[in-house]
UniProtKB/Swiss-Prot annotation:
Membrane topology category: Single-pass type II membrane protein
Active site, UniProt feature: 430
Species: Neosartorya fischeri (strain ATCC 1020 / DSM 3700 / CBS 544.65 / FGSC A1164 / JCM 1740 / NRRL 181 / WB 181)
Glycosylation site list: 226, 234, 402, 473, 512, 577, 893, 902, 988
Protein family: Belongs to the glycosyl hydrolase 3 family.
Keyword DNA-binding: no
Primary role: Beta-glucosidases are one of a number of cellulolytic enzymes involved in the degradation of cellulosic biomass. Catalyzes the last step releasing glucose from the inhibitory cellobiose.
One GO biological process term: cellulose catabolic process
Start and end residues of each stretch annotated as Disordered: 1-74
Residue numbers on the Cytoplasmic membrane side: 1-163
Classification via SUPFAM superfamilies: (Trans)glycosidases (SSF51445), Beta-D-glucan exohydrolase, C-terminal domain (SSF52279)
Location relative to the cell: Cell membrane
Official protein name in the record: Probable beta-glucosidase E
Amino acid sequence: MAPPDSTHGGSFRDHLKTNDRSSTSKGKQRYAPLHEAIPEEISSFRSPSEYADADTDSDSDHENSGSYQLRPVDRYGSHHSSAFIPVIRDDGGVETYLDSITEAEQELLSASKQYDLFDDDDSDDLDSDEEATLRYKLKDRLKRRRARLQAWPPVKYARIWWRTLLAVIVTLAVVVWGFLSFAVSHREEPKVWPMVPSDSWFPSPKGGTLKHWEESYKKAQSLVRNMTLVEKVNITTGIGWQMGLCVGNTGLRFADHVSAFPAGITTGSTWNRELMRERGVAMGREARLKGVNVLLGPSMGPLGMMPAGGRNWEGFGSDPVLQAVAAAETIRGIQSNGVMATAKHFVMNEQEHFRQPFEWGIPTALSSNVGDRALHEVFAWPFAESIRADVASVMCSYQMVNNSHACENSKLLNGILKDELGFQGFVQSDWLAQRSGINSVLGGLDMSMPGDGLHWVDGKSLWGSELTRAVLNTSVPVERLNDMVTRIVAAWYHLGQDTWERPPPEGNGGPNFSSWTNDKVGWLHTGSNDGSYAVVNHYVDAQGTGPEAHSIIARKVAAEGTVLLKNVDRTLPLSRNASSPSGGILRVGIYGDDAGPASGPNACPDRGCNQGTLATGWGSGTVEFPYLVSPIEALESAWSTEIESTAYLRNAVMPADAVDKDLCLVFVNADSGEGYISAGGIHGDRNDLFLQKGGDTLVRTVASNCGGGQGKTVIVIHAVGPVVMESWIDLPGVHAVLLSNLPGQESGNALMDVLFGEVDASGRLPYTIGKSLEDYGPGAQVLYEPNAPVPQADFLDALYIDYRHFDRYNITPRFEFGFGLSYTTFELSDLSISPLQRKSRSPPPRPADAVAPPVYDTSLPDPASALFPTGFQPIFKYIYPYLSNLDGTAPRNYSFYPKGYNETQSPSPAGGGAGGHPALYEEMVSVKLQVSNTGDRKGQEVVQLYVSFPPDVTEEGDWVEVDSDADKTGEKQRERMKIEFPERVLRNFTKIELEPSERREVQMTLSRKDLSYWSTREQNWVMPEGKFQIWVGRSSRDLPLMGEY
């Protein structure tokens, strides 16, 4: 989710008011969201020469570039970045542009088609005459735009026109010949996706088909069948931003007396399933004590395809299996408290740039374009495991997927999530990710959050009263609304929230805190300021006490999530009784802004700045820190003997500051976050993978001068993701490197645990650290500038994410995926592989639904029953399901349904259970080995299991004509298509703790799905014939054991 911080709500509302052509300041072209921007842009279209004069602040370097400058307005009303869009100079270009903005299920010209039902000023729909008028005006504007282009003066050709013409003809012939030759000899998937909508999948499958949800759906059916129309609509639509008391994410955002746990990326670095679940338990417990029903996490999208992606740190790592295991364990932990977890963001939310149009001044969000196989094998894999973990809610993402908005993408929500993966809970939108009314209902969205439509806090919802109207006039089938409501209510019953004990203090069971004020008394509806004042904060401490204190699990996760990357001559662990090599007092230097508390952890809203020690990224995935133990504070009491320490809590130091030190501790970081915040020149996504704030220079300066070249330098990195460290990692002065990721409130304490060896260095990398950003491949680069009116991010090689790409192209990383040193040593031996079932190509036929979904009366009520009750006084900007009048409630022949709406799809053969066909999760192989601690310390080893698929796998392709004798007619046969696989893929892992000389057996299993690939032709998981190679080791490139199956 990405709402603006409450402390800046006024500024953001001011921006919304001014984000309009009629109120732009001279020389600053402002762009409103699509449904406003397109008609106005068309009506005021100017030639390129006019554009050249339009922006008095344009960069002179671009005066003749054929581009004009868009200046996006951010939430604070300031200009942080510019996007250059090519000017359309010919009629064909205009036609192409207009075609592009009218595709994608009628999304991009939604002002004339989609929002006629859902974008009103006074809760009134446009009647049919107004609709016709709007469409007529729009078409007229388009005609006038083309006419102006055709009226441009013709180009005066030079006298050498014939030479130019000849050159053009020759060039075209060469290009055509080359293209045809390439097409014949190189039959592959196209390297760009055409800008066409995603496949359609209708109707939206009904919930209540799985046995373990049966009781919950029965209870829900009993309740829903007695609800009125407006009561049903009320459940599906949020009440509006800041209209309630709370908003929550990873932890409890904007709440008092809650814990700031280590980030997801730190949790993934533990590779410890038990800790993953314990962290989830603690998070769910705090939500329960604060009266929160739904926790908006965990995040498993972004997956980390782009190492510079701004929100990667909220997830658990750049591998679908690691991400899936951590997400599933977190969900089980959260929901063990009766709190609903939310699997987000479904799906392909891999970058922050252009995720929302109003954040970047573009017509609509970018499209993440991905193939069916990569979608299943990489990006949807964690969501499938989350559904197997019984997650109650899934959040759809901001951007488009294959040019259809994720929150109305019927293929994703209906076809994959609800049918194939058997999701029984409800789909909620990310905050303001809903971009249409009817299409989102039919496309599979069940709950609109926070209820606002296209703008924050404007009181206009795409659903609310407009959904009531759409059901009454039959634009939306009432049975679809019934399923939406039933899914939500069934999830409430499924988590036992109907029997919740009311959280302290005794009250109505709702939130006992306000996200919008720290005062005891405050507004009940902050977004309205309607005068409703009450006690809103009861200051309930949810952090636990004594042995149940959540700080304990936070510290454990932070410590086990710390990765030891380098350790020359056992520099670490440090001794608490250390002395100088000369026998005197140890002289310690502490360097870097990242070591200190600076202005405190909550100095910037939503942690939207990089100051002091970095303990979390920024954005809606953060919390208000109850405290933060910085490294410098923890170091003050770290030694048991007297030492001489000097702190330089800045990143600019002189060589002389290090020459007299025996030990130099350098603290550096790299930060990023959600796209609605820009900090330090970073607009959500990182600009590169280097350390920030001069960190690389700081490391080189200290490491080259510590002790005059005789001292030892230890580097501690706090980072949101991979950091390129080539400029200093091999310096002889760099003796040890610790990657502490984002450790949360117990940062300093957890670091001391590892630094001084109280716990083993047992973290392992959840991603690959390359030697440059380019090492990750062209498909892993953030799209920083729009490449089309609707930015297109093509995930052409998404099957080869992270270490898979390095393996594919034999690129040597600095530190591979899964890498991490320990303070002891381990040996893996005695691998044995045992089949548990016979191989078979495909799962058996899809099982029938275990339970029939609820059935309701679909008759419509009297429209008058949906009017505001007599004498009712609405709260300003609060979202209601009631109608203010009966306009547009008569049944109508609605004709703007998305493409494919009238085509019923067949159930997926890969479905039939939670997470997919039950047979996919049957164990096929047992893998056993012995693990021995061969060192002199207790330690933990992460045993990682990888699979290589058989070579030369093929499947039937298209029909092709085969050569035949001259006297015979031609014949056709299916060609065989070669199926490519990554060199190896992670499929299982476990973490084991051993005493010195201890030896223990480890057993892991592989499921059918682990040994299958997604066949785009068969639309099912297929286990290929041939021998699989099964690798076991310590990282993706340290795999001493291999066997075959």
